[in-house]
């Protein structure tokens, strides 16, 4: 197989989300969350998620049943559920399971990939032009260009992400982590709001917010209890790419 053969990205379809949120949360790791704007593409690799299981999950917004606020989570799979929390930021979720059955996945952290300067600006973070560290490999196929390098054995890439080799790299990673490490941060970086995005299809080719698979291979996944919640806090429903520096919060043991 040609090692420079393009890796084709594919838009995730509704069937991907039409299953148990735990399976979806794990499978989303390594995929790209993409926002199309008039000023260009914003994209981040999904590195951390949490599953919410519906009416049997005390921490889920659907635990007490269907309301006008949470109705998206009872609808078809693959739709954005956005809520406002703590009076200062939005959180993005995607609906799972068949229409009428509640369930969803929260996006907790992204590794910035494309449009980093624009995302930083949206977050109020100043990054000098030309000083942004580039990923060792950017999933350009997912953004409308040809990707390079594929695995001769599988056709899937397994790059761990940003290469950290010097102290200066650690400082840059620390700065970039402020862009989209955490559910509120990633929503602000991708300009996600409830008014703009709640109820939006993430599986439509016409949507300006979508999730694509660019054949990135996740090597190892860590599973822990969810964080930042009081109810059902010990259930192991948080998933993240092991060793990725953009994961938010501390890693509690399952």
Q: Predicted regions: what is each one?
A:
Residues 2-143, 147, 164-254:
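Conserved, well-structured core segments that form or line functional sites
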Residues 152-153, 160-161, 165-168:
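N-terminal polybasic/positive-inside topogenic patches
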């Amino acid at each position: 197989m040609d090692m420079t053969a393009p890796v084709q990205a594919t838009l995730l379809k509704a069937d991907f989300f039409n299953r148990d949120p735990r399976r979806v949360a794990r499978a989303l790791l390594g995929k790209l969350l993409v926002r199309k704007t008039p000023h260009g593409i914003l994209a981040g690799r999904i590195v951390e998620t949490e599953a919410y299981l519906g009416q049997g999950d005390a921490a889920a917004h659907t635990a007490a049943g269907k309301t006008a606020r949470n109705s998206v989570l009872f609808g078809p799979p693959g739709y954005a559920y956005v809520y406002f929390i703590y009076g200062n930021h939005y959180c993005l979720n995607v609906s799972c399971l068949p229409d009428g059955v509640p369930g969803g996945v929260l996006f907790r952290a992204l590794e910035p990939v494309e449009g980093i300067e624009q995302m930083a600006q949206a977050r109020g973070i100043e990054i000098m032009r030309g000083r942004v560290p580039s990923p060792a490999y950017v999933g350009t196929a997912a953004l409308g260009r040809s990707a390079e390098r594929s695995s001769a054995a599988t056709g899937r890439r397994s790059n761990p992400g940003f290469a950290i080799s010097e102290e200066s790299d650690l400082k840059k990673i620390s700065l970039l982590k402020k862009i989209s490490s955490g559910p509120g941060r990633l929503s602000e970086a991708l300009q996600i709001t409830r008014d703009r995005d709640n109820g939006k299809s993430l599986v439509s080719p016409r949507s300006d917010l979508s999730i694509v698979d660019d054949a990135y291979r996740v090597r190892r996944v860590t599973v822990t209890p969810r964080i930042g919640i009081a109810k059902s806090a010990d259930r192991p429903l948080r998933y993240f790419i092991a060793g990725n520096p953009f994961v938010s919060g501390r890693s509690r043991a399952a």
